Amino acid sequence: MARNIGLDVPIPETECEDVNCPFHGTLPVRGQVITGKVVSDRMNGTVVVEREFLHYVKKYKRYEKRRSRYHAHSTPCINAGVGDVVRIAECRPLSKTTNFVVVEVMTE
């Protein structure tokens, strides 16, 4: 049975046995919720999500494009792949670099 994680996201239809799943496991989510594009899924159970944003440069009165990358845990019930636009939520540290978990695949 899936539990409510406190975010307005649809609950996945398939169930998984992952302990670090926010829906079927015991992982609590809190903090930031970020939308980005999956650029790599080659790690086991982890995806790299890239977010582009505009940063204002005061000296030139212009905007420049910047991007940041986040490592996010991808559970078997969500199954995010390269090119998917996903929503990730902050959680406790799962490894040295992984502090986020995928909670929704918005577009494939």
Curated annotation (Swiss-Prot):
PANTHER family: 40S RIBOSOMAL PROTEIN S11 FAMILY MEMBER, 40S RIBOSOMAL PROTEIN S11-RELATED. Belongs to the universal ribosomal protein uS17 family. GO terms for biological process: translation. Pfam families: Ribosomal_S17 (PF00366). One of its GO terms (cellular component) is cytosolic small ribosomal subunit. Transmembrane segments: none annotated. This is Small ribosomal subunit protein uS17. One of its GO terms (molecular function) is rRNA binding. It comes from Methanoculleus marisnigri (strain ATCC 35101 / DSM 1498 / JR1). Gene3D superfamilies: 2.40.50.1000. CDD domains: Ribosomal_uS17 (cd00364). InterPro entries: NA-bd_OB-fold, Ribosomal_uS17, Ribosomal_uS17_arc/euk, Ribosomal_uS17_archaeal, Ribosomal_uS17_CS. Part of the 30S ribosomal subunit. Keywords: Ribonucleoprotein, Ribosomal protein, RNA-binding, rRNA-binding. PROSITE patterns: RIBOSOMAL_S17. One of the primary rRNA binding proteins, it binds specifically to the 5'-end of 16S ribosomal RNA.
